[in-house]
Amino acid sequence: MHYLNISFTYKNTDISVREKLAFDSDEKKDQILRLLKSSKNIIECMVLSTCNRVEVLAYTNDIKSAMTHIIRCLTVYSGVFEDELFERADIYEDSGAVHHLFAVASSLDSLVVGETQIVGQLKNAFKFAFDNASSGEHISRLVHYACKCAARVRNETQISKNPISVSSVAVAKAKEIFGTLENKTAVVIGAGEMGELAAKHLITSGANVIIINRSSDHVEELVENLGDKASWDSILKLKEYINKYDLIFSSTSAPHAIITGELIEPQEFRRYFFDIAVPRDIDLVNTDKISVYSVDSLEEMVRRNLALREEQAQTAYSIVGQSTNEFLKFLKDNISIPLIKTIRKKAEICAEAELEKALKKGYLKHSDKEEAAKLIHQVFKAFLHSPTINLKSLASKNDAEQIAGGIKFLFDIKEENLENLTKDIDEI
């Protein structure tokens, strides 16, 4: 069995393709998970979709077949040709897939290194897949260890000190443009996660915020929590607000652009639009009166922040490497320990059966049963001593899975029996 990760990020895929791949609703996530699980080679899977990445994580019995199937599913979903997806994708297998996910969870692969949103996004992605019966114990273990690794990085480095996200970078860019945001009014379109973060950063910077949203759901509570500097209005007044104010942030989950040239009225003042949505919310051309910043155009500012965190990132990568090795050792241990327990159980069952036969045929007195059982137990314990020691050493061998497969064949151990006998494995 293998772990496989196929990754499309800001590093290898521009926003025009990423927005086609984005799974920005539960319906779309459910659709792609159903497609992925239609292959017998995909045992478990989950999808992680954020403004900067789309990743498919799979647990598979055949990496090549799974890889081809995943790319075909993404083509069916997005309309992007298979060849282009293969060319753009970063593909990680086995230990590489583990290391990559741990780096992602630790925010080392993020556009903004050190941002803390990604752990929550990873947990939510797993929960959705698990609730929809697409993920099980194998991806669960991997995500659990990934979150443990992220916690270590957070606690043992200062990489998340003064954490920043795409939203905060956009606000910082606005502050750079205007000099100060104190008492300035900014319009935030959308009350989702990114919009909420943008509003919080704006208010922290001294700005007043008007949140434009399609419905009152969530936004009323959000405005109340944000305090006196926040208010909200209906999306029906979108045209009015984007022509009245000069600082606009947009982060909705709309499948198409909501701000286009048809809505723009000529104004004497210069307007600054920050599009932090994927797919993009804004379809405008930069002019002498309009400047548009997308997720990708914020990259230069983000990279300056990355340079400041480089030293901490090196320490964090060391932790990711250690955590990867720990997880791989856990996987190998999880091969040997169930095998040991199952072989011992089979020996015990066989010994008990032969003892009962001896009693029935009169070869052994019932009064001697207890002593005979002890003797048999000592015999198979002595016989299995060396195999047990050697099996425990499997964890240090690169070909552990192949050796384990041979042992299962010799002892006629089926995978389902192995799982049933070893659901609660104690240390041996």
UniProtKB/Swiss-Prot annotation:
It catalyses: (S)-4-amino-5-oxopentanoate + tRNA(Glu) + NADP(+) = L-glutamyl-tRNA(Glu) + NADPH + H(+). Pathway: Porphyrin-containing compound metabolism; protoporphyrin-IX biosynthesis; 5-aminolevulinate from L-glutamyl-tRNA(Glu): step 1/2. Keywords: NADP, Oxidoreductase, Porphyrin biosynthesis. InterPro entries: 4pyrrol_synth_GluRdtase, 4pyrrol_synth_GluRdtase_dimer, 4pyrrol_synth_GluRdtase_N, GluRdtase_CS, GluRdtase_dimer_dom_sf, GluRdtase_N_sf, NAD(P)-bd_dom_sf, Prot_inh_cystat_CS. Substrate binds at residues 50-53, 110, 115-117, 121. It comes from the Bacteria. The record marks 100 as: Important for activity. GO terms for molecular function: glutamyl-tRNA reductase activity; NADP binding. Its EC number is 1.2.1.70. Pfam families: GlutR_dimer, GlutR_N, Shikimate_DH. One of its GO terms (biological process) is protoporphyrinogen IX biosynthetic process from glutamate. NADP(+) binds at residues 190-195. The active site is at residue 51. Catalyzes the NADPH-dependent reduction of glutamyl-tRNA(Glu) to glutamate 1-semialdehyde (GSA). Possesses an unusual extended V-shaped dimeric structure with each monomer consisting of three distinct domains arranged along a curved 'spinal' alpha-helix. The N-terminal catalytic domain specifically recognizes the glutamate moiety of the substrate. The second domain is the NADPH-binding domain, and the third C-terminal domain is responsible for dimerization. Belongs to the glutamyl-tRNA reductase family. Homodimer. During catalysis, the active site Cys acts as a nucleophile attacking the alpha-carbonyl group of tRNA-bound glutamate with the formation of a thioester intermediate between enzyme and glutamate, and the concomitant release of tRNA(Glu). The thioester intermediate is finally reduced by direct hydride transfer from NADPH, to form the product GSA. PANTHER family: GLUTAMYL-TRNA REDUCTASE. This is Glutamyl-tRNA reductase. It comes from Campylobacter curvus (strain 525.92). The gene is hemA.
